[in-house]
Amino acid sequence: MKINTAEFIVSNSDAAKCPKDFLPEYAFIGRSNVGKSSLINMITNHKNLAKTSGKPGKTQLINHFKINNNWFLVDLPGYGYAKVSKKTKSIFQQFITDYFENREQLVCAFVLIDIRHEAQKIDIEFMSYMGESEIPFCIIFTKADKISKGKIDSHIAAYRKQMYANNWAEMPQYFVTSSTESIGKDELLTYIDEVNQEVFKNNSGFLNSI
């Protein structure tokens, strides 16, 4: 898939106020400072579509971007940032939960994980929540240019082992990416394109919204 247009639509903290367009949505979420904004800019070919920051926890709202006029990329706040107040964490958790559990247009979530680190408890717990809530998701491992292929394979194997230990029958589909070197971009966009084709083929509600 080629990205021809990418347009910021709206930011808000209430899932009920998200765009009414019945278009497929792909939500991106991960721990703070995982490289989410850089990844979004990389796959959309827009350097400043999502604002990048060295400060973890910068994204604090649900951000909708309309891509090619027929699907939404949704940028969600990061989880697990210790310096955010308990009250703010609670607010984040509530509207993220509301979005995931009530947003009919959500087709797939992408959970971003920094591949430089070994399996993190908070990522395993978040993916367990997604699985228990029956929310379809894939994993995107970021910053693959920062470590060797051997370490990448080792860290992915560690995540697979942890997920099996948490009663997963299999590991969700995953993508290995690097925003600085555009690694994984084509694979990720091809996946979204294939899912979109299935969505439009099997759901007239989505098709009629284009």
Swiss-Prot record:
GO biological process, one term: division septum assembly
CDD domains recorded: YihA_EngB (cd01876)
Keyword field contains GTP-binding: yes
Pfam family membership, one: MMR_HSR1
InterPro entries: G_ENGB_dom, GTP-bd, GTP-bd_ribosome_bio_YsxC, P-loop_NTPase
GO molecular function: GTP binding; metal ion binding
Cofactor(s) named in the record: Mg(2+)
Role, per record: Necessary for normal cell division and for the maintenance of normal septation.
Identification of the protein by name: Probable GTP-binding protein EngB
